[in-house]
Design a protein with these regions (language model features):
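RNase H-like, Mg2+-dependent phosphodiesterase core
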Residues: 1-153
Length: 153
């Protein structure tokens, strides 16, 4: 079973780093997917809903600023990917063989074979789906945070 992994929030100065993990079924319309950064918000939200409805499994994970400050942003992103993968794995407990494909040039600390794919969010449908999950969940969190703390923009 292939699980795509990606993160959102490594560049911004505020908020959590968020990772997405996605396992797509064979009949998923992968031709609709793109890197989340290449999609309009409207299209990204539609694809987010489609992924949530049709993925074989999907999950997100947040690592919060306090931990980011303690372990650094790169390690936090990898930890978030590992946590998101663990959540996906629990959704499919009968799967014996796993393989992760992670966007970027490093792999998260998971106990299954994992390959780093540079620009994977533009190449691999499972990573594209994970990218959409991560960006959408992080954006939703940041919009809620803005309502609570509007002075921070």
């Amino acid at each position: 079973m292939i699980c795509g992994l990606d993160e959102a929030g490594c560049g911004p100065l505020a908020g959590p780093v968020t990772a997405g993990a996605a396992v797509l079924p064979p009949d998923f319309p992968v031709g609709l997917l793109r890197d989340s950064k290449q999609l309009s918000e409207k299209k990204r939200l539609l694809l987010y809903d489609l992924i949530c409805e049709r993925a074989a499994a999907q999950a997100t994970a947040f690592i919060w600023p306090e931990e980011i400050d303690r372990i650094n942003i790169r390690q936090a992103a990898l930890k978030a990917m590992a946590e998101a993968f663990d959540r996906v794995r629990k959704q499919l407990p009968d799967v014996a063989e796993w393989r992760c494909l992670a966007d970027g040039n490093q792999v998260p600390p998971v106990a299954v074979p994992c390959t780093a794919v540079v620009k994977g969010d533009r190449l691999i449908p499972e990573i594209m789906a994970a990218s959409i999950l991560a960006k959408t969940e992080r954006d939703r969190y940041m919009l809620e945070a803005d309502k609570l703390y509007p002075e921070y923009g």
